Each structure stands twice: as C-alpha cells, then as structure tokens.
From Swiss-Prot:
Induction comment: Expressed constitutively. Up-regulated by abiotic stress and abscisic acid.
GO biological process, one term: positive regulation of DNA-templated transcription
Assembly behavior: Component of the spliceosome. Interacts with SR45.
Molecular function as annotated in GO: pre-mRNA binding
Phosphoserine PTM positions: 235, 243
Summary of the tissues where the protein is detected: Expressed in roots, stems, seedlings, siliques, cotyledons, leaves, inflorescences, seeds and shoot apical meristem.
Bias type Basic and acidic residues, positions: 315-335, 358-437, 515-529, 538-548, 562-574, 592-613
Protein's UniProt name: SNW/SKI-interacting protein
Keyword check for Transcription regulation: yes
Coiled-coil features, chain-numbered ranges: 135-170, 318-349, 391-421
Ranges where the record places region Disordered: 219-252, 315-437, 513-613
Cellular component GO terms held in the UniProt record: mitochondrion; nuclear speck; nucleolus; nucleus; spliceosomal complex
Compartments where found: Nucleus speckle
C-alpha cells in the first residue's frame, strides 16, 4: 500500500473552512439587515396634520408607525416598500460561488448582467479541440477518423438507396403494368414414346423435345378482372346511448305539424285557401309584433286636441246665444215701448215710464218670462180700459187671457222639466230627436230618405270607419260578388210590398187583379217592424213569403236527457273505446252520428275547384 506522500500534488486547492465574516459583501449585508431591523423598531415623533410644513420623510423612522403622507408631494417609501434595492452601493458586490469540484468560480464577473443568458468562454479548455482535450487520447485520433469516414459512407449509401427507391416508384408509375413478362428460358425433355415401331419417328426409341413458354401478345386485353376486396371490419361500432322511449304528447304532435306549402304566386288547381292558412304557411305568426309608443302618444294628443276644440266650440256657441238673447231683449224693449206709446196715444193718457235697465237685465235671463210680464202689463192696462169695452170684446179678451195663461203655465212647466233634465244629465225632446242614431230614426220613420231638403249633402263620419269597403280589403278571398248588399233594400215605398209572380197558382189564390187591388188599398207607410216588447201587432205587409223559425230547444244544456239516461240505467262512460283510434272523447259521444254508429268521426277532406269569373 502506497503512502499518502506518494500521491501527486493537487492542481487546485480550496479552503474548507473559509471565514466569510471578513468579506466586505458579508459585512454590508449584515449591517444592512441590522439597520432595517433597528429602523423598524425605532420611532420618530410625527408632527400634527397641519404642522408638517417643511417635513421631508426619507428614512423609515420619519414615518413613525404609519404610512406615507399624501399632503407631501415627494417620493416616499415607508418601511422601504417599493424602493429599488439595486441602487444601493453594496449591490455591486458579487457573492463567492464554487463549482462541483469545490473551486471558486471567478468567471461570475463576466457572466452577470447582459451576459447571464449567453455562452461565455472564459477558460483555457474552451479553446482546446474536442478530441485533444484529454492528454491520453493522442493515440486514438486515427481510429476516430476511420470510424468517422465509415459512418459517412454508411449514411451516403442509405441516402442513395432511399433516393433510388423514390425514383423507381415514379418511373414504374409511368410504365404500363399489365404487360406480362416473358421468360426466354427453354427446357429440353427426353422421353420414350409408346409407339416403338419403325414406322414412327424413323424407328427411334427416344425423343428429345424443347419446351418453350408460349409467347403472350402484349396488346391482348387482360383475361382476369381484378376485384376490389372490401376492407375487413375493424373494431365493432361504438354503441349509441339512447334515452328510453316515451309516449308522444299532444304538444309534441302540434310542434311537429308542418303546414302545407302554400305559394303566394301560384295556384294552378284553383283551390280556395283561407287567409289564416296562408298566414300560417307564411310564418308571420312567429314574428313578434312591436307597437311603437308614438301611436299611444298620437291618440292621446288627438283626444286632448278634440276636447279643447269641443270646449272652444261650446264656449263660442254660448257667447253667440247670449248675444242673440241680448238682441232679442233689446227688440222686445223697443216693441214694448212702442206698444205703450200706442196705448197712451189711444187713451189720451200720458206715457208711462220706460222700463229701467236693471229690470231689463234681470229679465234677460229668460225671454219667456218677458212675455209673461208683458201679458200681465197688458191685462192691467185692459182693466183700466174696461169701461170702453163692449160685452163681446170683454168675453173674447177674457178667453184670450185664459189661453195666454195656459200657454204661460205650459212654458213654465217645460222650462222646469228642461232644467231638471239638464241637472240629471238627460236631453230635452228637441235635442233627443236631433241626436238620435240613424238606425233609430229609420226604425221610428223619422229619417228623410227622399232627399227633399235639396241642400248640401251631409255625411255621417261614422259610416266611413267601418270594417267593410274597398279600403279595408272589400271582401273575403272566397267571395266573388261585386256588392255586399242590395242597392234598393232600404227604400221604404216599394220594398215593403210583397209582389207575387204573375199567373202563379191562379186557381188556388183566385184572380190576380183582385189581389193586386187589395195590396194597393192597404196602408203603405205603416212600419213593418216594431220595437221588441210592443203591445200592438204590426201590419201584415211583407217583402217576402212567410218564414218559419225553428222552435228553441227547451233543454239547451242536456240536463233532462242526462237525468233520463240515469233513470234508464245508462252510464256516461259506456261508449268509451267503442270508437276508432282517433277518438278520445269521454262521457258519451259528441254528436248524433257518434251516438248511432261507432268508429272514428274523421271524414275525408274534399277540395273543390272555385269558379273563376
């Protein structure tokens, strides 16, 4: 065993026990950590909020135990938060690092900053070739060169073989592949024939033949057809997980119901298709109808404008009535003064005093009250003139006064009734007759259909806001008539008469002339139809033969029939299941046909061709 002294000296030495406390970088770090700890412990008295003029906090102890001061416009770092530590003077000192062999890595100085991500060659071994790095590898340089050349040769051969394979595939694709290859080899076969006589083959006992493969014409079509073999099935198909079957509901059936295709341009068979079916096929019902808010605003504005216009019209009519009343009152005052003057001149007495203006204003409320006062004045004057009257004149005067008094009481009564009706919201007789609807006027016979007025034709605006006419589509699609009503149906003179056909059952009804005379002598202008609930019967004039109405059903809800079925022992659910597959009605059938016959109530739909005009 060799001693340790015989070992060679190491190339590089490292100090195992290295005192790091003497290094400058260690002292700086230790002192910095101590100052930070001491700064976090020491506190400085911070001035009050309004007494911080001139305060410039830079050190951690200037902040006390709090944060930064927002009223001081300086960069502040309480507890050194946010401060860049790379600006410190001790940050440029690099720590000592060692490699795997324990040697100090001095090239850390070169590998810092921008060279930290780069490959830096800082040692002597980095410039030595790879195969000369080790001192004992000088004898193996030649072997490595031979191996390198051998590897290069193998790689070249593999590359050449791959390129030739690709080229041969391209060349064989351009050449025809169905040409059979013909081998030029021939075979010689020696055999003994069965006929050994001298008459065959010159008496030879053995024969030698040359067998050659029969040549193939390259232009012949192929004798065999290549069939494509289907590819074998691989793994079984992936199972599809289905949900369990559930019965189809009515809603699902309605959702799956697809409307028939109805064209808006073609109808070659002339089917009459209702509008609702066209709209269902058009798909307009799927669109949401959005109504603009301006329609409501417009209608409200029109209503307000109409109310204001009505108020203005009523105010103008009221003012006009007052002006007419004042004018009438003035004329009555003048006539009263003239009558007083005439009476005074006739009797020879002095003129009476004129009516004061206050009295005229008080009497201007009601003109009929002025007439009454005028009659009373005349009565008193006639009493003074009694000695000059005869007996007959007096009787006539008294009769006239009675008539005037009766008329005055009638006017007073009408005035009270009108005031009472106005307070209760009722209309007077004249206003009621004037504001009657045209249908009521026609029913009462008050409508003037002859047009005797001869003035300007007045139209009712309500007649233009109807759901019929050319502006509203005129008629349905399945109607081809030009007018919806008859032209002379509302004529009250001729249409009220029922005219029988001439020479129609003359033997049964008698002479036609007598019947016509009887019709002509009847009342023509008596209304044919009266109001409902009238006591008196209407005339027998008709515009058509007698029509009989069906008697109303006494049991519309079927209660008596139900009670009778219960008495007979029938149950309402006896007929369930007796119908077809499409019937699901319970509690008995829904029609008489279902009651009589079982089976489905479904019928065949027949389309009819419409008549084109």
């Amino acid at each position: 065993m060799k001693s340790l002294n015989d070992l060679p000296a190491p190339k590089s030495t490292t100090t195992t026990y290295y005192d790091h406390s003497n290094d400058a970088w260690f002292k700086n770090r230790v002192t910095e950590s101590e100052t930070v700890k001491s700064s976090s412990i020491k506190f400085k008295v911070v001035p009050a909020y309004l007494n911080r003029q001139g305060l410039r906090p830079k050190n951690p102890e200037d902040f006390g135990d709090g944060g930064a001061f927002p009223e001081i416009h300086l960069p502040q770092y309480p507890l050194l938060m946010g401060k860049n530590k790379s600006n410190k003077p001790g940050a440029k000192t690099l720590p000592v690092t060692v490699d795997a062999q324990g040697n100090v890595v001095f090239d850390a100085i070169v590998r810092q900053n921008e060279n930290s991500r780069k490959i830096v060659y800082s040692q002597h071994k980095d410039i030595i070739p790879k195969f000369l790095k080790n001192e004992g590898d000088l004898g193996t340089v030649v072997d490595e060169e031979e191996e390198l050349q051998k590897e290069i040769q193998e790689t070249a051969e593999e590359t050449k073989a791959a390129i030739e394979k690709i080229v041969n595939v391209r060349l064989s694709a351009a050449q025809p592949s169905n040409i059979a290859r013909q081998s030029g080899d021939s075979q010689y076969i020696k055999y003994k024939p069965s006929q050994q006589s001298s008459a065959f083959n010159s008496g030879a006992k053995e024969r030698i033949i040359r067998m050659v493969e029969m040549p193939v014409d390259p232009l012949d079509p192929p004798k065999f057809k290549h069939k494509r073999v289907p590819r074998a099935s691989g793994s079984p198909p992936v199972p599809v997980m289905h949900s369990p079957p559930r019965p189809v509901t009515v809603k699902d059936q309605q959702d799956w119901k697809i409307p028939p295709c109805i064209s808006n341009w073609k109808n070659p068979k002339g089917y009459t298709i209702p509008l609702d079916k066209r709209l269902a096929a058009d798909g307009r019902g799927l669109q949401d109808v959005q109504i603009n808010d301006n329609f409501a605003k417009l209608s409200e504005a029109l209503y307000v404008a109409e109310q204001k216009a009505r108020e203005a019209v009523s105010m103008r009519s009221k003012v006009q009535k007052e002006m007419v009343m004042k004018d009438k009152e003035r004329k009555e005052q003048e006539l009263r003064a003239l009558a007083q003057k005439a009476r005074s001149e006739r009797t020879g007495a002095a003129m009476s005093m004129p009516v004061s203006s206050d009295r005229g204003r008080s009497e201007s409320v009601d003109p009929r009250g002025d007439y009454d006062n005028y009659d009373q004045d005349r009565g008193r004057e006639r009493e003074r003139e009694e000695p000059q009257e005869t007996r007959e004149e007096r009787e006539k005067r008294i009769q006239r006064e009675k008539i005037r008094e009766e008329r005055r009481r009638e006017r007073e009564r009408e005035r009270r009734l009108d005031a009472k009706d106005a307070a209760m919201g009722k209309k007077s007789k004249i206003t009621r007759d004037r504001d009657r609807d045209i249908s009521e006027k026609v029913a009462l016979g008050m409508a003037s259909t002859g047009g005797k007025g001869g003035g300007e034709v007045m139209y009712d605006q309500r007649l233009f806001n109807q759901d019929k006419g050319m502006d509203s589509g005129f008629a349905a699609d399945d109607q081809y008539n030009l007018y919806d009503k008859g032209l002379f149906t509302a004529q009250p003179t001729l249409s009220t008469l029922y005219k029988p056909k001439k020479d129609n059952d003359e033997e049964m009804y008698g002479n036609a002339d007598e019947q016509l005379d009887k019709i002509k002598n009847t009342e023509r202008f008596k209304p044919d139809k009266a109001f409902t609930g009238a006591s008196e019967r209407v005339g027998s004039k008709r515009d058509r033969p007698v029509e009989f109405e069906k008697e109303e059903e006494q049991d519309p809800f079927g209660l008596e029939k139900w009670v009778s079925d219960l008495k007979k022992g029938k149950k309402p659910l006896d007929k369930i299941g007796s119908g077809g597959t499409m019937r699901a009605s319970g509690g008995g059938g829904s029609s008489s046909r279902d009651d009589d016959h079982g089976g489905s109530g479904r019928t065949k739909i027949n389309f009819e061709r419409s008549d084109r005009r």
